[in-house]
C-alpha cells in the first residue's frame, strides 16, 4: 500500500488561497460549518460578498435584517450576517480591519454612468456577480445589497451623508466567516474607482473545512 502525502502537505493543499483577478468575480458553494477567509493581498481593495441558501437561492443575505439585529452598521468579529428570512448565514469570527460596508449596492454600468462619466464604462461587481451566480439559478433581479469587505463608508451622524473613502486594509489583512448553512457565495475584486483608492487589485480567498 502506497502511503499518502504527509499531513503537513495535506494541510498546505487544503488552505491554499485562490486569487480573484482585479475587476472580476467568482461564485462557489460553501458548506455549513466551513470557514471562508477573504484576504486583501495588496491592501486598499474592496471585495463584494453575496450569500444565498444553497437549497433555495430565493433566500439571500440581507443588510436590513442584519442591521436590525446587530443594532449597528459597523459589523465586525462576533456579528452575524442574516438572511432575508431572518436566519443566520455567516458569522464573522475574525477581522483584521474592523471597517466594512453593508449599505451600498454592487457597482454596475449605471454606477459608472452616474459617478464616473469621464471613465470607460465597466459592468462592475454587479455584472461580474450576475455572470458568476447565473449557473446557480441566481438572476440579476435576485442580487441584493452586498457585504462589501474592507469598504470604508463613514456616515455623518448629524446629516446622514455618506462618504466613500479608501479602505484602511493593509496587505494581507483578512476577514473570516463561518457558514451557518449550506451557501452559494458570490465574491469579487471590486471595480469602482473611489472604493479602492483609485486603483484595482486582486482579492484572495481561502476555504477551510
PLM features: residue spans?
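Acidic, Ser/Thr/Pro
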Residues: 4-209
Amino acid at each position: 500500500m502506497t502511503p499518502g502525502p504527509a499531513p503537513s502537505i495535506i494541510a498546505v493543499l487544503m488552505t491554499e488561497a485562490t486569487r480573484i483577478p482585479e475587476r472580476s468575480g467568482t461564485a462557489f458553494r460553501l458548506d455549513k460549518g466551513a470557514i471562508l477567509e477573504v484576504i486583501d493581498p495588496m491592501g486598499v481593495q474592496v471585495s463584494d460578498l453575496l450569500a444565498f441558501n444553497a437549497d433555495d437561492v430565493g433566500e439571500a443575505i440581507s443588510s436590513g435584517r442584519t442591521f436590525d439585529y446587530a443594532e449597528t452598521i459597523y459589523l465586525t468579529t462576533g456579528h452575524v450576517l442574516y438572511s432575508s428570512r431572518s436566519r443566520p448565514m455567516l458569522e464573522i469570527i475574525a477581522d483584521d480591519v474592523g471597517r466594512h460596508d453593508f449599505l451600498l449596492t454592487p457597482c454596475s454600468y449605471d454606477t459608472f454612468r452616474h459617478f464616473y462619466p469621464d471613465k470607460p464604462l465597466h459592468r462592475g461587481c454587479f455584472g461580474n456577480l450576475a455572470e458568476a451566480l447565473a449557473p446557480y439559478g441566481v438572476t440579476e433581479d435576485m442580487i441584493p445589497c452586498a457585504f462589501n469587505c474592507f469598504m470604508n463608508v463613514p456616515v455623518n451622524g448629524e446629516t446622514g451623508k455618506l462618504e466613500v473613502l479608501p479602505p484602511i486594509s493593509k496587505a494581507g489583512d483578512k476577514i473570516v466567516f463561518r457558514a451557518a448553512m449550506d451557501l452559494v457565495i458570490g465574491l469579487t475584486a471590486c471595480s469602482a474607482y473611489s472604493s479602492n483608492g483609485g486603483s484595482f487589485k486582486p482579492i484572495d480567498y481561502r476555504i477551510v473545512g
